[in-house]
């Protein structure tokens, strides 16, 4: 009760201070809906803020302002506004706004995702850029990804005629791909009931939910020290559970490297240990590599499978391309340059269903001007990648799934075309983008080449529900269940 009383007093004090002083000095903010006293626009937002932001952009334009408690939030919903934030003013707007739930000791300051652009951040990104995600490393590991896809097909062949929650199969496959890239071994046994894959996924998704759940301290920063609803504590517990999954493997490797004659495996763990990274840095880095490399990619592939299920003509066209180029052998990553329709299908999936609907929020290091509006120092900035991908001013028939729009098009998602930014852009662009592209394309191609599938209980594709579950990543709700069968 004492904590609640102190917190209530903090809300009242911070609100009074804002009413007295908070609105002065920034008379040229972007327009936006009128805020209510104290809470601002908080109560005007629902369960799908990305969709609401896109609607607000139709009224207020490329960039608009929301008051979230005492915090000022600027939202960009067009490619031109995104370009200003992610390119023109990339350095000034490169700081990270960290959700209170994620401010766990030892994590934020060692995080590629959440820390500011410090020397530690630069060193960690350098390790990723020069060791893990180089073209040479990606190509050298292609056979591992292809082998795991073959194992996935073998598993699904054993499930013919049964309902399969496809995202769990995808997730387990991706975890083992990353496990081999990082530890040179599988993490879980695909399909085994006690393999731990589901537990790992639940930890990750719960953390993503907590990051986007309502936390009064995000809107009234004076409450930050109290952790009123235990969200920071729960994130810390999730991290502890995740670290335990690979902790034994990490400790075993440390001991092995101390033995004379140790033969380096040349995997990412060896690189981390040889680079002198401490346990906090290694755990934070592995957490984000597994999290970003599995959860976001799994969601994207599930969305691709959903769209292909709803659009059998597109599936047939993709399958025909694979048959023409690849023939009877298994598709390989080296085939990708000759598979333009596969590339277009991946792009179209990322346009309609970006893995992170709202790019992780940035924070202004200095006051600057965007599109003739003032963006104050410490303002929170959000870029609505979901809304930009569906902007009718940019895309013809934007709600229709049509890979053809990307055939003979130079538009790409590598951070140079601001109409398609599922992985962000600028210095905060996802460092794992090159390998994520390989994951997504390979698994989609493997499904289409090797499997036929239908919906359970004779359900028509016309009745397939395509709803979104909003979080830091965008999941399909309800999950996609299919009944696999081998292709004749």
Swiss-Prot record:
This is (S)-N-methylcoclaurine 3'-hydroxylase isozyme 2. It comes from Eschscholzia californica (California poppy). Pathway: Alkaloid biosynthesis; (S)-reticuline biosynthesis; (S)-reticuline from (S)-norcoclaurine: step 3/4. Heme binds at residue 430. Keywords: Endoplasmic reticulum, Heme, Iron, Membrane, Metal-binding, Microsome, Monooxygenase, Oxidoreductase, Transmembrane, Transmembrane helix. Pfam families: p450 (PF00067). 3'-hydroxylation of (S)-N-methylcoclaurine. GO terms for cellular component: endoplasmic reticulum membrane. One of its GO terms (biological process) is isoquinoline alkaloid biosynthetic process. Belongs to the cytochrome P450 family. It catalyses: (S)-N-methylcoclaurine + reduced [NADPH--hemoprotein reductase] + O2 = (S)-3'-hydroxy-N-methylcoclaurine + oxidized [NADPH--hemoprotein reductase] + H2O + H(+).
């Amino acid at each position: 009760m004492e904590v609640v009383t102190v917190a209530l007093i903090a809300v009242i004090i911070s609100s009074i201070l804002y009413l007295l002083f908070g609105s002065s000095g920034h008379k040229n903010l972007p327009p936006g809906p009128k805020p209510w006293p104290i809470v601002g626009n908080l109560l005007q937002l629902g369960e799908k803020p990305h969709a609401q932001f896109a609607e607000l952009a139709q009224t207020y334009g490329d960039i608009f302002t929301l008051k979230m408690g005492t915090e000022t939030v600027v939202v960009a919903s067009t490619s031109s506004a995104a370009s200003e934030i992610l390119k023109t003013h990339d350095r000034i707007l490169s700081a990270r706004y960290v959700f209170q739930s994620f401010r766990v000791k030892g994590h934020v300051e060692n995080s590629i995702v959440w820390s500011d652009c410090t020397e530690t951040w630069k060193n960690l990104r350098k390790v990723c850029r020069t060791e893990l995600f180089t073209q040479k490393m990606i190509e050298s590991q292609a056979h591992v990804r292809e082998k795991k896809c073959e194992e996935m097909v073998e598993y699904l062949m054993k499930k013919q005629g049964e309902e399969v929650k496809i995202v769990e199969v995808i997730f387990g496959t991706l975890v083992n791909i990353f496990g081999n890239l990082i530890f040179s071994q599988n993490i879980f046994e695909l399909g085994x009931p006690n393999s731990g894959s589901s537990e790992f996924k639940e930890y990750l998704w719960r953390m993503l939910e907590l990051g986007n759940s309502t936390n009064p301290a995000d809107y009234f920063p004076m409450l930050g020290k109290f952790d009123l609803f235990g969200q920071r504590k729960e994130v810390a517990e999730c991290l502890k559970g995740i670290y335990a999954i690979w902790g034994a493997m990490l400790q075993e490797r440390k001991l092995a490297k101390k033995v004379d004659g140790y033969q380096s495996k040349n995997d990412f763990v060896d690189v981390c240990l040889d680079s002198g990274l401490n346990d906090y840095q290694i755990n934070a880095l592995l957490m984000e590599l597994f999290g970003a490399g599995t959860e976001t990619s799994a969601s994207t592939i599930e969305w691709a499978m959903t769209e292909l299920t709803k659009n059998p003509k597109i599936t047939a066209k993709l399958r025909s391309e694979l048959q023409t180029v690849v023939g009877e052998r298994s598709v390989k990553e080296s085939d990708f340059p000759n598979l333009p329709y596969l590339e277009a299908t991946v792009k179209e999936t990322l346009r309609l269903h970006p893995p992170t609907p709202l790019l992780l929020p940035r924070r202004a290091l200095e006051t600057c001007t965007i599109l003739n509006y003032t963006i104050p120092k410490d303002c929170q900035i959000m870029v609505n990648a979901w809304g930009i991908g569906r902007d009718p001013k940019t895309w013809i028939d934007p709600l229709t799934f049509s890979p053809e729009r990307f055939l003979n098009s130079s538009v790409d998602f590598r951070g140079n075309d601001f109409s398609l930014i599922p992985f962000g852009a600028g210095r905060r662009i996802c460092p794992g983008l090159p390998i994520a592209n390989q994951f997504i394309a390979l698994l989609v191609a493997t499904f289409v080449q090797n499997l036929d599938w239908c919906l359970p209980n004779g359900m028509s594709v016309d009745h397939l529900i395509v709803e979104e579950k909003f979080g830091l990543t965008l999941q399909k709700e309800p999950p996609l269940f299919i009944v696999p069968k081998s292709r004749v």
